[in-house]
Amino acid sequence: MKNLKYMITGALIASSIFAKDLQEPSSWNNIRFSPKLATDDPAYTLINIGNFGYWQKYDATSAHTPSGGSGGIYPRGTAANVYLDGVLVGGYTGDVLHVSGTIYTNGLVGGYIDDAGDLQQGGDVRIYRIRKNYESLTFDQVRLDAAEINETTVSSVSDAQMQAVLDQYEADWENWPTHLGAPFYDLDSDGVYEPEDGETPGIADADQVIWYVASDADVATTASLYGCTPIGLEFQFTLWGYNQPGAALGQIVFKNIRLINKGSEDLTEAYVSLWSDPDVGDYTNDFVGVDTSLSLMFSYNGGPDDNDYAAFGLAPAAVGYDFFAGPIVESAGDTAISNLQKLPGYRNLPASSFGYFVAG
């Protein structure tokens, strides 16, 4: 895996029989406050464009809120169905076993690995979130966004918090880090970001996109996970969603993980694993399963009712993780999907195993 780039595209999928569309009444357009409050280095952000609320932190902590709670929330504004999730990569350099990634302990830090193998942090290395219609959001849409990102109620949102949401969208759009690997619409296919020629940030015609980069380049942090030394592995995360709360796409968060081995040795016999601690409302009665034909791992409530969801008048939701396009390997005559493009001569690997443990 030396200097090779692997793409994994997956999806977090939720469903609820009684899920309702979020209501965002129209009000003033192009509302602006003052002063500007964009943050140069936000630590957290979330996908909250459809019916799913899904938190991310710049160091690859995933589905966990800034206040330490469950960070997969479905439907938005109601109960949670994911407490924490992450990705693990394991393999050998020579006869030395390495494992990098995130579980309850995080073995990654925010930042990328430069050509000299050094960790680069600060400056433009942070978490970004864009929304393509941010300039035309209504007063109520901004207020709802501010409530969710500040973990407060709509009635408690301040003008300053609303302004910060707008300013952050603008700052992230204007400073979208294509030079670090963030996706954009390359109209002339030359690999160069040229906004003056109409090229814009984004992927897959999504309405909202998050991008950030993390790595296993910090020795102490990597060792805290499983006692291993770093691989020199860079993780570039792109997440996106669609403003379709009443349609199927509105129940999905897409996640693309770009893995780049910037170490000096090949990583062999490598495995990539997604893991999750799903808490479907009350965590004490959840079940899990897998559909091997779909590479779909899922969790659901053990009964027709759940106290957390009942508080909102809802039946309990279910949640699943699907490999839409797993890691690729050479395979003559086949065609893989990588970076949302067809790649002849390769195939995508499906999920090869599934495991679970019970705790609590």
Describe each region flagged by the PLM:
Residues M1-Q23:
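Bacterial Sec-dependent N-terminal signal peptides
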Residues K20-G360:
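A long-range scaffold signal marking pre-active-site subdomains of enzyme folds
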